[in-house]
Amino acid sequence: MEVHKVVAPPHKSTVAKLKTKLKETFFPDDPLRQFRGQPNRTKLIRAAQYIFPILQWCPEYSFSLLKSDVVSGLTIASLAIPQGISYAKLANLPPIVGLYSSFVPPLVYAVLGSSRDLAVGPVSIASLILGSMLRQQVSPVDDPVLFLQLAFSSTFFAGLFQASLGILRLGFIIDFLSKATLIGFMGGAAIIVSLQQLKGLLGITHFTKHMSVVPVLSSVFQHTNEWSWQTIVMGVCFLLFLLSTRHLSMKKPKLFWVSAGAPLLSVIVSTLLVFVFRAERHGISVIGKLPEGLNPPSWNMLQFHGSHLALVAKTGLVTGIVSLTEGIAVGRTFAALKNYHVDGNKEMIAIGLMNVVGSATSCYVTTGAFSRSAVNNNAGAKTAVSNIVMSVTVMVTLLFLMPLFEYTPNVVLGAIIVTAVIGLIDLPAACHIWKIDKFDFLVMLCAFFGVIFLSVQNGLAIAVGLSLFKILMQVTRPKMVIMGNIPGTDIYRDLHHYKEAQRIPGFLVLSIESPVNFANSNYLTERTSRWIEECEEEEAQEKHSSLQFLILEMSAVSGVDTNGVSFFKELKKTTAKKDIELVFVNPLSEVVEKLQRADEQKEFMRPEFLFLTVAEAVASLSLKGPSLSNV
């Protein structure tokens, strides 16, 4: 068999290596490549298009695209208006703030966002988290002005955090919210949100401030004397209507407009019923009078000092992470369906600046919602102009239609919220996770039950902590396997995976399947020593020749640090004492370079013990074995 040499990598300066490492870490998409070799005018145009994606598609915009965007924009507006009012109440904010948040942020996103399908506005989970975290220290009833100030300040910090992640290209931080974590978190939050609506659906006036399931259910059954049969009847009727339209649209996607228009129709019909029958005099709670006009400025309400600074910063951080994760996940989902690319870092900047601007214009945390984006996509949206159309529709509502909402019953808003969040409970995905990875399923359950029985933020923290623990376990306890030869071939595979694979007498072939660093070097030392001892005992029992070669297959070792180098040096000393030669197979360039630097005495990086494949190593060493052992 021909033996190929392992060559040292081309020399690179430290600066060049650092530059390459930083580029691959923070700029894997190489955004500057489009500027190379271009005249200055072209560079300026492309820079403007990169910062403002609207400039990319705006010159080619046509009337046919406008027709599609107008239809989709009006469709999502019919959903955004009742949802905006409902989600604001979920966040313990005045209902009008929900409409403000459906006006300004979509305009900002239309200019800065890169997704064609993302429909921007308030979302249930971020609303729940914002309201619950702020209410722990400030009552929205006793001090509504301060509560509103803290909500806007939290929105500013959320936007600042989101935009900073995009500018610094640190989006990988949100990847710690794994799919299992999100499914459990969203499912638990959906149940908590639904339970919170029991206050409105039953007509209860005195309700607990806690969010977990036990206090909520206790409060519901402790105040049965406050239950209003009129409210219950209206709530059940509209809830059944909304759930029926949702089920119909799921069964027949072409009828998406049925579920999209159902919330607005429910608001209109219920408002007419309350107005005609004066139901507010018979126990039906209504929104009340809402102010007319566009968003008033709120930058003077932002708080950057005082005793509540830590609260708003923490609330902004949590809501920022959750809303950013949801927005990017939704954007990427629909981009994949339509075969176009969404730049994650651009999205972070767009969503972040959208919230920063929103905090100064009486808006609270917004992002791209899955329900509205799905409707936007089904309605035929072609560009972000659909967000502009939705925003203009909300503007008209704010200017001229606000008196119509005075008699809108709160119970219908609760029914709208329950219908919207029930889709967040994804049982098929949970079953899929159970089949694939039991630990991920455990993480999902911890997130789910943590949200339900503790709090939204604690449930999220537990799930993220378990995800980090899983990553640490994978880093500190890397996979390492014994390899054997598949008879009749030159292929070497895991002995425990391929039962036909056979270990070669006199050789111990180990495959390390991770970088070797300070976190796992001690574990690898103990694991390797144990296998050497077991192999020697096995050789003695079967009366084979003694173990002569320890072969390390290193194709998956992408890097080593100082501790990793020490691991190999100590391993060489250990094997030398046992008259065993240490052999390296296919070490990568970074590993070769560092080991050669550390091997000043040329003790273990000798060419005769470096091979490209395990088969070449075994074939070559089998011929030279006895002589090489004494070199």
Curated annotation (Swiss-Prot):
Please indicate the ranges of residues that lie on the Cytoplasmic side.
Answer: 1-69, 114-117, 166-171, 245-256, 331-347, 406-410, 463-631
An annotated Gene Ontology molecular function: symporter activity
Q: Does the keyword Methyltransferase apply?
A: no
Entry superkingdom: Eukaryota
**Transport recorded as keyword:** yes
Q: What sections of the protein cross the membrane? A: 70-90, 93-113, 118-138, 145-165, 172-192, 224-244, 257-277, 310-330, 348-368, 385-405, 411-431, 442-462
What is the protein's name according to its record? Probable sulfate transporter 3.3
| Gene (name only) | SULTR3;3
